[in-house]
Amino acid sequence: MSINRNISKLGGALRKDKIARELDDEIQTHIDMETDENVEGGMKPDEARQAAHRAFGNVALAQEDSRGAWIYRWANDFAADLKFGVRMLLKNRGFSAVAVISLALGFGLNTTIFTVVNAILLHPLPVRDISGLVQLDTVDSKTHVTAANFEKMGLSYPNYEDYRLQNEVFTDVVAWMNTPVTWSGGAEPKQLQAYLTTANYFDVLGLRPALGRFFLPGEDTHPNSDTVVVISYALWANKFGMAPSAIGKPLILDAIPYTIIGVAPRGFKGTVSLAAAEQTWVPISMYSQMLGGFSIDAVHDRRFLAMTAFGRLKPGVPMAQAEASLKTIASRLETEYPKENSGRSVALSSLAEAAVGINQHEQFTLAGAMMMGAVGLVLLIACANLANLLLAQAATRDKEMTVRAALGAGRGRILRQLLTESTLLSLSGAAVGLLIAYWGRNILWSYRPAFIEANDVDLALDSHVLLFTLGIALVTGALFGAAPAWKASSPDLADTLKAGGRGNSVGWRNNPIRSLLIVVETAMALVALVGAGLFVRSQINAQKINPGFESEKLFVMAFNVGALHYQEGPAQQFYRAAAERAASVPGVAGAAIAANFPVGGGFSRTVFPEGQDEASGFRGTLTVTNSVTPTFFDALRIPIQAGRVFNDNDRKETRMVAVINEAMARHFWPNESALGKRFHFFGDTEMREIVGIVSNVVVIQVGEDPQPMAYLPMAQEYVPFATLQVRTTGDPQASISTVRSVVQQLDSNLAITNVQTIHEIMSDALWAPRMGAALLTLFGGLALILAAVGVYGVLSYSVNQQRHEIGIRRALGAQEGDVLRLVAGQGMRLAIVGLVVGLAVAAVFARLLVSLLFGVSAIDPWTFIGVTFVLLAVALLACYIPARRALTVDPLIALRYD
């Protein structure tokens, strides 16, 4: 027996482990046969086996040589397949170009969307082992909440300290809060964000400084003395030119010099994924220098949930176990501090989710999945088109396949060659798709909302994006190449096409694969169009939503007088002067000061009506508050429903008053007038009398259910950060620069920020539905075009294959209408089946989009009916063109070849 012959057979094995087993079996068989021959020659069995082993030689070396021979042959065959595949693609340049462009479009869209999803959802923070980091939130069972934003809240600093010291599930726990600060080191004051953190912040995240050092243990324990700061890489690059000498230099924040001790690593901007790139971090011990108003006292008050906390789990500790352990501590704290912690417990969530926003993560995930699904449909339709093209091409390669089979090529060998060709097409499309994605991500990101700067999110085509593109390219190559390759490699391929080029019509019986592809293409196109239609309708409805105030001819700007250490008296004088100066500018109809931006949320406090409080077990309601000056309601044109609004007589020394919205009135006093009623806030026993009721306005986000809102006089409820809201008689853009100038003249060190028209604010608020509508319309349109091209291509091929049949029918007297019905009917029957399937699938998946839609049902009949008619019309057009071409068939010429 020849061992080389056996090794040669092994070279055809498909699996490595199978090859190894067969190789061992063959070697053992050879030795056994040699042993038997030696025994027959007179040797003893043991001697015979030893002699056989000596004759064979080194078994391990033979195994290694055999494996090397197999690998060499496999590599040689693979190289030959690649070479032949490239030659075939170059030979059919037109087909290859169409295929690569179609795939590149699909890959480019998929990679573009995945780049954004990867940056925001999959890898939101550049920290070590993010899976081990979890955020701690307070859940208050005794406080009624009216919005999902309030279901989970932060921790009080004293509670944080208890959790940190008493837990046994974390290696360490961090607390932080952020606040706007004024940087005074440039040409003009600028607002930055400062993280007030515990000293272990960077250590728990597992970060190393790009330059300098981070906080030392204990560097957060000296109130007003730990004047050190860590700056972000972007701030270092933009403000210090990446100079190493920045370490040790002062950074003036809120008029106080902080010594720069370190630079955070590139790409890190804190534990909020959509935060600005320019950030600063200072020790929590500097809170009294950076916070204003009652926030100064809130840091050490167990009642106020001012801190965000996260910890790193100990190895092997699951999140559920950690949460159960912390709930035990929470119960103990509730017993020890019943007034402050009654009804409060703790909940954990992954920091990866919390970085996007605990309440927004689900929305972002759903939106990301929807976009990936939409572009995935486009790619799948492109795959179906290519599969049909390859099926058509397979008929032209019938002779080639027959010759290859006759020369000894097995079906597996032919399959591998054809799949190599389809994979080469796919990889070529992926390469071009990466170029599309490189430009596409920048184009897509240029439509981001104004509050996100271009460099706030790193949309790099990193290793994750490249691996994703490579993965879908390989899967796609197999997907659109499998059916054509299987059909082309069939031993009976020659029987499917009769001599002379006759073919079959399109239909389940004659061409089941191609018919199925048409149905799938049509169904996927309809699903994509339904999604686009729902979002377009949603966007139209969102734009019609009344915010509750007149949004035209209105602009705002913000400033933080607390950053310049204004006391309340001078700050109130500044506010009055700013509003008066703004109102005196030509073209300005009115101006007011308010704590909150329109559609910007606000500080929330728990409200208790008179006669009810936490001691009586009453469940208070978390309510958004807004401190405003008397001219606020007139400037914003908020309708007064009852009572009055504030006036100059509402001062600190007079009775405490409030104006509430209709939602708050209905919530607390549903069957009676709220005028004259009184309430107090959690932790504050002083009663406030309701003197007026105004219409509801959008508080947190467009499309929300009306939220309870309490307006307080700025003179009675001072805040050190405020917005100037200005009503104009004409275009607000014409007055912005003048108003900004007159306010800046009051204090040249004041940073004036967030200068926007209300139109811009509303536009930002509707950014997500607007982008969703635009992108899904684009993707749906592409899906429609690709599906139409697919139907057209299949029917065109069918007409070519049926020329003899059509010629015979025409010769026997068939009219033009008969031929049109014959050809167009083939495609329309399949398109209608696809529509039915698509409607069923769309009805199921549309229900997942309910939370993303404004004022439109997921099963909106107008959308489904409209999309169905559009797709039917396009399908009919795609069928009609080949059908018209069938009328040009000359019966005499067609029959001449029969």
Regions found by a protein language model. Name each.
Residues 66-97, 354-360, 389-416, 420, ...:
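Alpha-helical transmembrane segments of integral membrane proteins
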Residues 387, 423-496, 537, 826-887:
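Small-residue-rich transmembrane alpha-helices
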Residues 1-101, 312, 346-347, 357, ...:
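Negatively charged linear elements and acidic catalytic determinants
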Residues 125-180, 304-310, 540-542, 546-606:
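Membrane-proximal extracellular/periplasmic loop immediately following the first transmembrane helix
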Residues 94-120, 124, 382-383, 426-430, ...:
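Short, strongly hydrophobic transmembrane alpha-helices
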Residues 117-133, 141-144, 276-295, 352-361, ...:
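Short juxtamembrane loops and helix-capping segments at transmembrane helix boundaries
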